[in-house]
Amino acid sequence: MSFNTFGHMFRVTTFGESHGVAIGCVVDGCPPLIPLTEADIQGDLDRRRPGQSRFTTQRQEADQVKIVSGVMAHPESGAQVTTGTPIALMIENTDQRSKDYSDIKDKYRPGHADFTYEAKYGIRDYRGGGRSSARETASRVAAGAIARKVITGMSVRGALVQIGPHKIDREKWDWDEIGNNPFFCPDKDAASVWEAYLDGIRKSGSSIGAVIEVIAEGVPAGLGAPIYAKLDGDIAAALMSINAVKGVEIGDGFATAALTGEENADEMRMGNHGPAFLSNHAGGILGGISTGQPVVARFAVKPTSSILSPRRTVDREGHDTDILTKGRHDPCVGIRAVPVGEAMVACVLADHLLRHRGQVG
């Protein structure tokens, strides 16, 4: 299986399967002399970790990260810093229940990658989906923590802005609310509605989709390159690579189809520090290059395909059959996708920052 690596100057390769011994990543291209400890990474992993509320999978994984290579004690200060060599990170799997999948090992789960993996490779890991499991995203979050150390001066924050038909009230957006509820929701009132709504979804054994918004602030103008290395193109590709993501938009995205040219164009005036934009419909990117405004991206995740209702499918022998999925699953995978989306945007920004330095100094 190829294509487990993304990025150009800041390159991330992830490895491991849902029910394997461990998962992890190798980050290549990180500059030297950046302070980096396991604690710097653990905080981000803890935000994504499963089993923290009744609204996420009850698989209990500590997600304790171990730095295997790429760091050493600074010869003068003694602080642990990056050396410029590949940084290998490993996270052990400790709570696999492969027996939960033995009854369906010869059946293709609707909505999952079972059929397509076997069609391509002639073999698939039925134990939790193997590489196609959202378990893989812990490695991305670990890499994103390193990326954040590269893009100093920039902040990348995400929020859940919609679950099913229920959206936040943007007038009530408060970043301080993110840590006060289990949804990464910036609207206190919406979080209360979601709690009752998702309880109903969870108890019925069903699932629901969601929309996540990621905002990067402090991004300097000039990141990205025209045509085939656009910043928004790479952000879109990075977010689309996350499990269950079915749509991405930058700025006002699809809503711009209903706007006139006068409404959509971000007008400009001279400000105290040079040209300033009067709006940000473009989401901080024009012509594939950052404008200096906040970079805004949203992505939609589908409902978790593993639900308790029996569904029609076929087996590996080509027979029609029914399937009932057991195991432990997220009723809304969008919740834990928030730190994953942040990580992917951080990695893309780190990559483009290093590419920008290499091209223009």
UniProtKB/Swiss-Prot annotation:
Q: What class of enzyme is it?
A: lyase
Record-linked PROSITE patterns: CHORISMATE_SYNTHASE_1, CHORISMATE_SYNTHASE_2, CHORISMATE_SYNTHASE_3
Q: Which residues bind FMN?
A: R131, S132, S133, N243, A244, G287, K302, P303, T304, S305, S306, R328
Q: What GO CC terms are in its UniProt record?
A: cytosol
Query: What Gene3D superfamilies does UniProt report for this protein, alphabetically?
Result: Chorismate synthase AroC
Q: Which UniProt keywords are given for this protein, alphabetically ordered?
A: Amino-acid biosynthesis, Aromatic amino acid biosynthesis, FAD, Flavoprotein, FMN, Lyase, NADP
Which note does the record give on the cofactor?
Reduced FMN (FMNH(2)).
**Does the entry annotate any disulfide bonds, and if so which pairs?**
none
Output the superkingdom of the source species.
Bacteria
InterPro entries cross-referenced by the UniProt entry:
Chorismate_synth, Chorismate_synth_AroC_sf, Chorismate_synthase_CS
Record-listed NADP(+) binding positions: R48, R54
Biological processes, Gene Ontology terms: amino acid biosynthetic process; aromatic amino acid family biosynthetic process; chorismate biosynthetic process
Cofactors that this protein relies on: FMNH2
Its annotated pathway? Answer: Metabolic intermediate biosynthesis; chorismate biosynthesis; chorismate from D-erythrose 4-phosphate and phosphoenolpyruvate: step 7/7
EC annotation? 4.2.3.5
Give me the reactions it catalyses: 5-O-(1-carboxyvinyl)-3-phosphoshikimate = chorismate + phosphate
- MF-aspect GO terms: chorismate synthase activity; FMN binding
What job does the chain carry out?
This reaction introduces a second double bond into the aromatic ring system.
Description of how the protein assembles with itself and partners: Homotetramer.
HAMAP family (alphabetical): Chorismate_synth
Give the family this protein belongs to, as stated in its UniProt record: Belongs to the chorismate synthase family.
Query: Which PANTHER family has this protein been placed in?
Result: CHORISMATE SYNTHASE
Name of the protein: Chorismate synthase
From what organism does this protein derive?
Rhodopseudomonas palustris (strain BisB5)
Q: What is the lineage of its organism?
A: Bacteria, Pseudomonadati, Pseudomonadota, Alphaproteobacteria, Hyphomicrobiales
